[in-house]
Amino acid sequence: MACRSHIQPSDLACTMQLALAWIILGACGGSHQFQARSQGHLGLASNLGTNQVQLAGDLQASGPQPYMMIQDPDSQAFPLPEPCCPSEMDTPETSGPGIFPPRCRTPSSGCESFLGHLQRALRNRFHLLLLGVRQAPPLCEELCQNWFATCEADITCGRTWLWPSGKRSCEGRCRTYGQTFADGVDLCRSVLGHILPVAAPGSRHCLNISISLLPRPRPGRWARETISQRSRRRGTGILDAGGSGSGSGSGSGP
């Protein structure tokens, strides 16, 4: 059963699980440095056309960041869980407390950005639960499919990111999303379980991440040359048409 919004003893456990999911997304996915205070002005906005709740706001520049500990300025720091796929890591231990060593592979910018947006969505959902707001919407199927497509070639912690025993279920070697999950729905249900249920296909009231917020890959040299050649061809065609018209006009004159 999905977590309800009213803060009662049982719901408090759901709220804490949701906070853990928010933390694990950074630990397994590679996102921005976690801090106790909110950064940026991101929130949830309702799409009146589809009744879907989407992440909205200004996103600060993002890029691969080192894995740091969660730290509250008013409390002692505590480290995040161990990094994913430790068996393939051949790196010395870090000197600072609570700092993650590198993982198997640096995450792609697209996957890292997507997980950063998803973390913010979880944070907003967490706040709604604490405020006693009505039950937050489930994840849109489109969000799960976009997550899978964006991170398909990236490394994942395993099929389950939330463990009752507190231990990871990493296999002997690092595996990609594509090797681990069948599709986006399988990804969401396996990774986040009942904490963030997936809405039925075509549902109009669910949590989605607008693709327009994600960074688009810059076109390569070949793509830029192709676009430039097409532009020149279009421009030449227009000039030729104009020139022939001008020539026809001059020829018909006295």
Curated annotation (Swiss-Prot):
Top-level taxon: Eukaryota
Signal peptide: 1-29
Cellular component GO terms, alphabetical: external side of plasma membrane; extracellular region; interphotoreceptor matrix
Main location as per UniProt: secreted
One of the record's GO molecular function terms: riboflavin transmembrane transporter activity
PTM per Swiss-Prot/TrEMBL: Not N-glycosylated.
Protein name listed in UniProt: Retbindin
Chain residue ranges for the region called Disordered: 227-254
Role according to the record: Riboflavin-binding protein which might have a role in retinal flavin transport.
Protein's cellular compartments: Secreted, Extracellular space, Extracellular matrix, Interphotoreceptor matrix; Cell membrane
One Pfam family per UniProt: Folate_rec
Chain's gene name: RTBDN
Keyword terms of this UniProt record: Cell membrane, Disulfide bond, Extracellular matrix, Membrane, Secreted, Signal
Disulfide bonds: C104-C174, C111-C151, C144-C188, C157-C170
Topological category with respect to the lipid bilayer: Peripheral membrane protein
Biased composition (Gly residues): 240-254
Family of this protein: Belongs to the folate receptor family.
Organism: Ictidomys tridecemlineatus
